[in-house]
UniProtKB/Swiss-Prot annotation:
It comes from the Bacteria. InterPro entries: RemA-like (IPR007169). This is Putative regulatory protein SYNPCC7002_A1845. It holds the Pfam family RemA-like. NCBIfam families: MtxBflmRegRemA, PRK04323.1. Belongs to the RemA family. It comes from Picosynechococcus sp. (strain ATCC 27264 / PCC 7002 / PR-6) (Agmenellum quadruplicatum). PANTHER family: REGULATORY PROTEIN SSL2874-RELATED (PTHR38449:SF1), REGULATORY PROTEIN TM_1690-RELATED (PTHR38449).
């Protein structure tokens, strides 16, 4: 099994193999997940002080905050898994 890494902005990288979900931070349940992760010490803030636009949830219950759009992270995730997608325009 090869390790795949995804750039989530500002030089920060997460392991694609460990990502469970990439979601928007707007809903109340996601805000609760962020708050709970902060209380447990499992929140990673990779926004560099900018507005949180994507919340990445991992299989280890860590929650990563990113300043780039969830669609952008998801696109990087798909392109990483299937390089042929990089050649096609959506």
């Amino acid at each position: 099994m090869e390790i795949q890494l995804i750039n989530i902005g500002f030089g920060n990288i997460v392991s694609a193999n460990r990502v469970i979900a990439i979601v928007s931070p707007e809903s109340a349940p996601i805000k609760r997940i962020i708050s709970d992760a902060r209380d447990r010490g499992q929140l990673i803030d990779a926004t560099y002080g900018r507005r949180t636009r994507a919340v990445i949830i991992t299989d280890s219950s860590h929650v990563v905050l990113s300043a780039i759009q969830p669609e952008t992270v998801a696109h990087r995730f798909v392109v990483q898994k299937d390089p042929a997608m990089a050649m096609t325009k959506v």
